[in-house]
């Protein structure tokens, strides 16, 4: 019995010893690191060294420096155990000198696997980890060196583009100023041409209406002539009967007729109905009929009258008789002139005008309405016309119209008594008419002086001046069609040029309002598009305009230019075409340093939201270059790490 008890006691003692040894081994494997700040990033070291009491980052508790990395989790967020695996949410920082740092979950510490290239995560000695950071960092250092070289070259290009941007902006501003000045001058010229064109069109319209009126009156006169033809023939027959009866009775018909014909005709013309007094029935309805169908008796009277006048001239030796004979002869000549003129112009004058014309010639009274018969010149009138200048007031009273009869007269030369207008007057008036409108351009440019190589604007100014001088709207001849067409053509061309200038001004003003970056480094982007072919799509990004996705002849608008974002790190395009049952398309282009402008890596990370990368010298910043150089210098100055051997 005693032997059994002793053996049981020995067995329990052995088990306890084994458990103690096992616990000791476990305790030894999870022992805290020798470096209390192991696993802490350089940025967080200050947080842990600031005071003797450290607060958990979530603010739940506080712990002392002795509790830091003691292999017991005091903070739920793992703040107190960055270098051990005690807290499941803790993070371990691999320094990896000579290569890139890495952050691990604390659960990987002392797990028998070398996660850090420097082997710092397996510090308990159970696993021997070689330090491979230097070899592993060699490729990273080479990439860093290449990146620094790219920044160096890109920075040179960027500086050049900035200088070019300054020159370009100055050029744009100078061009805008010049165009505004040219616009002001050209607008004045266009306004002058427009005024002259409108004046010509008004005159042409008046001429058209006048021509229609004359054609209408001509038709009415022809109709009246046909209606009065029968009455005129009847009157002729009556006159022949009267003459025959006078001869049969033995009466001196010629002398009586000479004495009474003049007064009878005056009476007939005066008795002709005016505009307010309609002609009585049975009487001739048109003077044109009388002028066209001349009474043979009247012709006989005129001939006999001329014979008696010539005989009286030869039989009367006194001055008084000669004067009377001369006066009668002149009167007869005047009557013949009137008859001839009426015969020639019967188709061009209305019946009222013919009546007033004949009556005024007989009575010596001047008709209220001037007719073309008034244009028949006399010898005295010709002499006075040659020496009498036309005043500006008279020119203004002339509305510039002339009937078709006048035009035919000047062409046929039937009434060549008209003397040509004085050229000196015409030149003087042209000069006055061109000065009737004075634009601001007259203050800036002298039309009389041209350089050996005149600019387009000077050529236009000279052409417009010549046109305005050549086209005289107050002349007494109809508007010259060729000159009118010339005015219209020059107006159209000048207006087109003005529209182009105004469009260019608007474009320049919009351009100068764009955001080209703090140093205008993105000035070269204006008006440029960058393309990238990816699969079946071609992506096109146009700065300050739009971005599109093209497939064959199909085009999808990804967005309109919006702005730069995040300190000019992104270009934003918004309000693209709407996705079916989704949002409007949009695009964000990330800008990075490169030696040329190149669009790449277009993707659609979210539905209808596109992303792309654009390399450009504009993003090769000097501050970023210095940062890269410091990083490389730090890596190169590190000693080559030694192998992490087991202790």
Curated annotation (Swiss-Prot):
This is Glucosidase 2 subunit beta. Its main location: endoplasmic reticulum. Disruption phenotype: No visible phenotype under normal growth conditions, but mutant plants have compromised defense response induced by the bacterial elicitor elongation factor Tu (EF-Tu). PROSITE patterns: ER_TARGET, MRH. Regulatory subunit of glucosidase II. Essential for stable accumulation of the receptor EFR that determines the specific perception of bacterial elongation factor Tu (EF-Tu), a potent elicitor of the defense response to pathogen-associated molecular patterns (PAMPs). Required for sustained activation of EFR-mediated signaling, but not receptor FLS2-mediated signaling elicited by the bacterial flagellin flg22. It comes from Arabidopsis thaliana. Pathway: Glycan metabolism; N-glycan metabolism. Residues 395-410 have a biased composition (Acidic residues). It is found in: Endoplasmic reticulum. Residues 155-235 form a coiled coil. Residues 206-453 are annotated as: Disordered. Heterodimer of a catalytic alpha subunit (PSL5) and a beta subunit (PSL4). PANTHER family: GLUCOSIDASE 2 SUBUNIT BETA, N-LINKED OLIGOSACCHARIDE PROCESSING.
């Amino acid at each position: 019995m005693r032997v059994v008890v002793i053996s049981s006691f020995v067995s329990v003692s052995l088990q306890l010893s084994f458990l103690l040894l096992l616990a000791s081994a476990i305790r030894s494997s999870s022992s805290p690191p020798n470096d209390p700040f192991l696993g802490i990033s350089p940025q967080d070291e200050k947080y842990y060294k600031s005071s003797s009491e450290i607060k958990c980052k979530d603010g739940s508790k506080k712990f002392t420096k002795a509790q830091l990395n003691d292999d017991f989790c005091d903070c739920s967020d793992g703040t107190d155990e960055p270098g051990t695996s005690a807290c499941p949410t803790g993070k371990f920082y691999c320094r990896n000198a000579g290569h890139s740092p890495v952050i691990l979950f604390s659960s990987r510490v002392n797990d028998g696997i070398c996660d850090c290239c420097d082997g710092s995560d397996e510090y308990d000695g159970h696993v021997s980890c070689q330090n491979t950071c230097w070899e592993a960092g060699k490729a990273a250092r080479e990439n860093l060196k290449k990146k620094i070289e790219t920044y160096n070259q890109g920075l040179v290009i960027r500086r050049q583009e900035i200088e070019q941007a300054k020159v370009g902006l100055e050029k744009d501003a100078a061009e805008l100023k010049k165009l505004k000045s040219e616009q002001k001058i050209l607008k004045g010229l266009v306004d002058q041409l427009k005024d002259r064109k409108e004046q010509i069109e008004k005159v042409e319209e008046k001429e058209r209406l006048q021509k229609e009126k004359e054609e209408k009156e001509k038709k009415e006169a022809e109709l009246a002539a046909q209606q009065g033809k029968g009455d005129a023939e009847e009157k002729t027959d009556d006159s022949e009967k009267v003459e025959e009866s006078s001869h049969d009775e033995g009466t001196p018909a010629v002398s009586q007729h000479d004495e009474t014909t003049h007064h009878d005709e005056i009476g007939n013309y005066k008795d002709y109905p005016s505009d307010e007094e309609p002609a009585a029935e049975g009487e001739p309805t048109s003077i044109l009929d009388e002028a066209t169908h001349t009474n043979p008796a009247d012709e006989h009277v005129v001939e006999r009258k001329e014979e008696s006048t010539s005989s009286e001239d030869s039989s009367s030796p006194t001055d008084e008789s000669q004067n009377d004979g001369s006066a009668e002869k002149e009167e007869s000549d005047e009557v013949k002139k009137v008859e001839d003129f009426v015969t020639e112009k019967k188709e061009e004058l209305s019946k009222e005008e013919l009546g007033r014309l004949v009556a005024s010639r007989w009575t010596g009274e001047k008709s209220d309405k001037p007719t073309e018969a008034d244009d028949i010149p006399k010898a005295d009138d010709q002499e006075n016309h040659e020496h009498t200048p036309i005043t500006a007031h008279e020119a203004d009273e002339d509305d510039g119209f002339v009937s078709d009869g006048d035009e035919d007269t000047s062409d046929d030369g039937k009434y060549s008594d008209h003397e040509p207008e004085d050229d000196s007057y015409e030149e003087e008036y042209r000069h006055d008419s061109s000065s009737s409108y004075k634009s601001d351009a007259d203050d800036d440019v002298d039309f009389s002086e041209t350089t050996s190589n005149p600019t387009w604007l000077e050529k236009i100014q000279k052409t417009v001046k010549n046109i305005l001088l050549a086209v005289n709207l107050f002349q007494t001849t109809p508007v010259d069609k060729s000159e009118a067409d010339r005015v219209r053509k020059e107006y159209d061309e000048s207006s087109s040029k003005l529209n182009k200038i105004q469009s260019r001004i608007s474009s320049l003003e919009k351009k100068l309002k764009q955001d080209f970056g703090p140093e205008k480094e993105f000035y070269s982007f204006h008006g440029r598009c960058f393309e990238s072919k990816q699969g079946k799509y071609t992506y096109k990004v146009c700065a300050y305009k739009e971005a599109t996705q093209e497939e064959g002849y199909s085009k999808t608008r990804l967005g309109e230019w919006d702005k730069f974002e995040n300190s000019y790190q992104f270009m934003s395009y918004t309000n693209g075409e709407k996705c079916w049952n989704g949002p409007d398309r949009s695009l964000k282009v990330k800008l990075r340093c490169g030696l040329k402008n190149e669009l790449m890596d277009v993707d659609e990370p979210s539905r209808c939201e596109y992303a792309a990368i654009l390399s450009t010298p504009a993003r090769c910043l000097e501050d970023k270059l210095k940062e890269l150089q410091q990083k490389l210098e730090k890596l190169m100055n590190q000693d080559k790490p030694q192998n992490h051997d087991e202790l």
